[in-house]
Amino acid sequence: MKKKILFWVLGILGVLIIGGGIYAYNVYSSVSNTLKEVHQPLKRDQNNSNVGEKVSKSEPVSILLLGADERGDDKGRSDSLMVITLNPKNNSMKTVSIPRDTYTEIVGKGKSDKINHAYAFGGVDMSVATVEKFLDVPINYYIEVNMEGFKDIVDAVGGVDVTNDLEFTQDGHHFAKGNIHLTGDQALAFTRMRKQDPRGDFGRQMRQRQVMQGVIKKGASFSSLTGYGDVLAAIQKNVKTNLTQDQMFDMQKNYKDCLKNSEDIQIPGDGHKAADGIWYYYVPDAAKQDLTNKLRSHLEVTK
């Protein structure tokens, strides 16, 4: 299940399309309408007619999975950043979790800061540009999830089951060790905690993956999604992507086997306070170059 981080949205939509039986037409129509609403091109791509060619040609692609911590009118920051590369030629997938406190240049701001601040400064467009600059790899697509509203998606599928390896209390919810069931509100608190975890941001990233995987597990059974309208309403409200409907379906069809050969990558570095008293995560140039080389090779990028 750990391999399916990217496909939690695509998987649910795909299941609704192909598993609906006699409801197929109504489901397809509803999904189609939802995908039109969640589609939001990057500014750089609005006049680029070739933006979807990589998926249609089944070429290696990269996707930024961005969890935005938006609360009310507060634009927030990116709470979670994962870069996923898919190579359908050798059916392989690599997932890189970027610590949100990573110190790097914020493209378009003329200064360096925590990488998750790019979202607060310039939304998903600046986040994509900053991640591209940091990793020195092209980001072809993005999927943005509003983590505050993610609880609606969890509730829409009837909650999720996870295995918790650390007892803690967060936002008024207590989480015991072992197998536990989470409602939407509980899932949000479960994925936000990091200060009580000795693993810090890495521990939180692990919990975020568990919850996303739990959503996929529920989505794998159409019988559990008879209220698919609630799922689509939650997705429409809380998800944005520059993937079109056709690209999503092509990806669901042609890139699935990439999950069979998956590698999760953590970025090595050192976290400490800078002279300004702010805590940053610093990635050595050599470690970053090694990561860049690995991702560029996987994407078959030569220049």
UniProtKB/Swiss-Prot annotation:
Cytoplasmic side: 1-4
Metabolic or biological pathway: Cell wall biogenesis
Localization of this protein: Cell membrane
Uppermost EC category: transferase
Topological category with respect to the lipid bilayer: Single-pass type II membrane protein
Family, similarity comment: Belongs to the LytR/CpsA/Psr (LCP) family.
Protein's recorded name: Polyisoprenyl-teichoic acid--peptidoglycan teichoic acid transferase TagU
Lineage of source species: Bacteria, Bacillati, Bacillota, Bacilli, Bacillales
